[in-house]
Swiss-Prot record:
Annotated family: Belongs to the semaphorin family.
Protein name: Semaphorin-3F
Compositional bias ranges of the Basic residues kind: 775-785
InterPro entries assigned to the protein according to its UniProt record, in alphabetical order: Ig-like_dom, Ig-like_dom_sf, Ig-like_fold, Ig_sub, Ig_sub2, PSI, Semap_dom, Semap_dom_sf
GO CC terms, sorted: extracellular space; glutamatergic synapse
GO biological process annotation, one example: negative chemotaxis
Source species: Mus musculus (Mouse)
Length: 785
């Protein structure tokens, strides 16, 4: 019976979640690990490989209505096909002028890494145009770009567009060179609408911005000065008053790094709509020991600022701390404070999306990453709670306990609670003054179950980005997490509830998405097309959300993978699709039980085990290889000397060493001969991976066969055919039971020894032979005159 999405997700998030010491949180092992070359060989990934002299790709906008994805990079704006990013890409070359680049270099900036036009903002203006901004070599600029609707007539001036490998890009300039109108070139930039990007895009390309364009009004968290010291949340464009946060007020913003902006309505009343900003900043709570805190801030869209105080500044700005920590057994929490990325998972209720956030630890002693999940109910509860206030003899932070002005600070005008006030300019002065000095909430926002959903400690990488997809499987709906790392890989992870009210994390796969490892910068997902798009400094890759065939060719392998995208169809592991036939698709994500799901397909599991014969010499070592298909399986070695004997498990001893690749037998003895079986057990399903029949040969017999006396080896007379190998002549003289085994051993030995190449005439001799023959010195006398 199908389980609804809400019931399964609630069972995961509301079950008991016991605290685990942080030192015990080991990195999960992926079931499938693919290199970039192996990923390309599957045919499920494509890398944007057009020869552009650019770097720093950022996926800035996904337009599923037009099947396009818009990417910004250094000096370029790209429009890529969502189905195939290499199919006829549209490319605008938008570089800063040479004069501006020269001025940037003279100001002390790097000519390659800073003095370029790094595109940092692409927002949908309307159905036909985009609004784009770039750093402009430390001179931010913005303009409009035609989306590329073929039915629309083009203006007489336009950018030349690259539509293939052989196309050319226009020469860089602040104002592009006009070209002749072409109906084919429909993706173009409008140079006559070029304007300043101050308050919309940063000067420094290393500083990130978070933006949202709502009702033709641009909201952006950005640094607005050349030195990168004045950070603000701005509102520009549109008909409303231009707004910003209070300038140089560390209580509002203190050296922030903006991550994400999202419009989330509070109620059915549109006047209650709020824009949420996610960022990290240096905390002002403890100035003697400043730390980095993750924050969530919000503003009302209809905020007009104050009448006498906070003129043209936000009068509804509030912020709270986002906590992502692991509680310890002693009550001390290990915090992950550096917010890196945010993904907002929409639900059927647009007012209550689920917030996924990636955090990393501060400092260099302890390195770790975590993913925490937050609910809007908890976020709203904190913003409706007490304000942080400094009071007492030590001037410490306390919850504000005085008289609260009306309307409550942070309330939107004309909304559910203030229907009579049409503007924030109508608010009393005590409300505005309170907002200026009390922007911080006293309580913090904690994740669901007050602990992370995913934790990575002791790993050689850090998480950088997150994207989430909801997948309908045979036994319910699951949330699949795609996590980008700073070494250029993407992990596919699901977290399942267990019967004992704990949770279980499964890393289904880890793939390298770039030829050259580079940190994943941005990532977006298309559930409609079942594709994931990943960007870094070196390029853009799009890959399928599933590679079912990589799990194996058996029903048990497909079932044990527990991938919600995949199921056994009777022939292979393939994409799961809902069917009216109950047994047409074998899938068990919740339990992964192949014994129950793969009845009729498991009988051949042991029959298909690889069997081999291996030889060893007494006193030497032998390595028996065993590579189970799943790294999550438990491997055991069983030994059987004769068919009539019982199999016994090989324990780790002085002479037996178990490794990830197999079993090493040191100092072989004649009693070690027999049948070795490598078994893999996963989720109570056991099967034989490989069988090795080991023959142990005596040292004396092998030595005599390989190095016989000279009298035995007599060269045959000419014309009698190839000489008989000396070990065969010795074998005819010996009558020991293991002579046949020695013969097989030697045949295999000589078959694998590469033949010695014959010396060509004039070939160089070894130095020791060259030294034996000294060259003769010739004296050349001048001819007699």
């Amino acid at each position: 019976m199908l389980v609804t999405a809400f019931i399964l997700w609630a069972s995961l998030l509301t079950g008991a979640w016991p605290a685990t010491p942080i030192q015990d949180q080991l990195p999960a092992t992926p079931r499938v690990r693919l290199s970039f070359k192996e990923l390309k060989a599957t045919g499920t990934a494509h890398f944007f490989n057009f020869l552009l002299n650019t770097t720093d790709y950022r996926i800035l906008l996904k337009d599923e209505d037009h099947d396009r994805m818009y990417v910004g990079s250094k000096d370029y704006v790209l429009s890529l096909d969502l189905h195939d990013i290499n199919r006829e890409p549209l490319i605008i070359h938008w570089a800063a002028s040479p004069q501006r680049i020269e001025e940037c270099i003279l100001s002390g900036k790097d000519g390659n890494g800073e003095c370029g036009n790094f595109v940092r903002l692409i927002q949908p203006w309307n159905r036909t145009h985009l609004y784009v901004c770039g750093t402009g070599a430390y001179n931010p600029m913005c303009t409009y770009v035609n989306r590329g609707r073929r039915a629309q007539a083009l203006p007489w001036t336009q950018m030349q567009v690259v539509r293939g490998r052989g196309s050319r890009a226009t020469d860089g300039a602040d104002r592009p060179t006009p070209t002749a109108p072409r109906q084919d070139y429909i993706f173009y930039l409008e140079p006559e609408k070029l304007e300043s990007g101050k308050g919309k895009c940063p000067y420094d390309p290393k500083l990130d911005t978070a933006s949202a364009l709502i009702n033709e009004e641009l909201y952006a968290g950005v640094y607005i000065d050349f030195m990168g010291t004045d950070a603000a949340i701005f509102r520009t464009l549109g008909k409303q008053t231009a707004m910003r946060t209070d300038q140089y007020n560390s209580r509002w913003l203190n050296d922030p790094s903006f991550i994400h902006a999202e419009l989330i309505p509070d109620s059915a009343e549109r006047n209650d709509d709020k824009l949420y900003f996610f960022f990290r900043e240096r905390s002002a709570e403890a100035p003697q020991n400043p730390a980095v805190y993750a924050r969530i801030g919000r503003i009302c869209l209809n905020d007009d600022g104050g009448h006498c105080c906070l003129v043209n500044k936000w009068s509804t700005f509030l912020k709270a701390r986002l906590v992502c920590s692991v509680p310890g057994e002693d009550g001390i929490e290990t915090h992950f404070d550096e917010l890196q990325d945010v993904f907002v998972q929409q639900t059927q209720d647009v007012r209550n999306p689920v917030i996924y956030a990636v955090f990393t630890s501060s400092g260099s002693v302890f390195r770790g990453s975590a993913v925490c999940v937050y609910s809007m109910a908890d976020i709203r509860m904190v913003f409706n709670g007490p304000f942080a206030h400094k009071e007492g003899p030590n001037y410490q932070w306390m919850p504000f306990s005085g008289k609260m002005p009306y309307p409550r600070p942070g309330t939107c005008p004309g909304g559910t609670f203030t229907p009579s006030m049409k503007s924030t300019k109508d608010y009393p002065d005590e409300v505005i003054n309170f907002m200026r000095t009390h922007p911080l909430m006293y309580q913090a926002v904690y994740p669901l179950q007050r602990r992370p959903l995913v934790v990575r400690t002791g790993a050689p990488y850090r998480l950088t980005t997150v994207a989430v997809d909801q997948v309908d499987a045979a036994d319910g709906r699951y949330e699949v997490l795609f996590l980008g790392t700073d070494r250029g890989t993407v992990q596919k992870v699901i977290v399942l509830p267990k019967d004992d009210q704990e949770v279980e994390e499964l890393m289904l796969e880890e793939v390298e998405v770039f030829k050259e490892p580079a940190p994943v910068k941005t990532m977006t997902i298309s559930s409609k097309r079942q594709q994931l798009y990943v960007a870094s400094a070196v390029g853009v890759t799009h890959l399928s959300l599933h590679r079912c065939q990589a799990y194996g060719a058996a029903c048990a392998d497909c079932c044990l993978a527990r991938d919600p995208y995949c199921a056994w169809d009777g022939q292979a592991c393939s994409r799961y699709t809902a069917s009216s036939k109950r047994r047409s698709r074998r899938q068990d994500v919740r339990h992964g039980n192949p014994i129950r799901q793969c009845r009729g397909f498991n009988s051949n599991a042991n029959k298909n085990a690889v069997e081999s014969v291996q030889y060893g010499v007494a006193g030497s070592a032998a390595f028996l290889e065993c590579q189970p298909r799943s790294p999550q399986a438990t491997v055991k070695w069983l030994f059987q000397r004769d068919p009539s004997d019982r199999r016994r498990e090989i324990r780790a001893e002085d002479r037996f060493l178990r490794t990830e690749q197999g079993l090493l037998l040191r100092a072989l003895q004649l009693g070690d001969r027999g049948l070795y079986s490598c078994t893999a057990t996963e989720n109570n399903f056991k099967h034989i991976v490989t069988r090795v029949q080991l023959h142990v040969l005596g040292r004396d017999a092998v030595h005599a066969a390989l190095f016989p006396p000279l009298a035995v080896s007599v060269p045959p007379p000419p014309g009698t055919g190839p000489p008989t190998p000396p070990y065969q002549e010795l074998a005819q003289l010996l009558a020991q039971p293991e002579v046949g085994l020695i013969h097989q051993y030697c045949q295999g030995y000589w078959r694998h020894v590469p033949p010695r190449p014959r010396e060509a005439p004039g070939a160089l001799r070894p130095p020791e032979l060259q030294d034996q023959k000294k060259p003769r010195n010739r004296r050349h006398h001048p001819p007699d005159t």
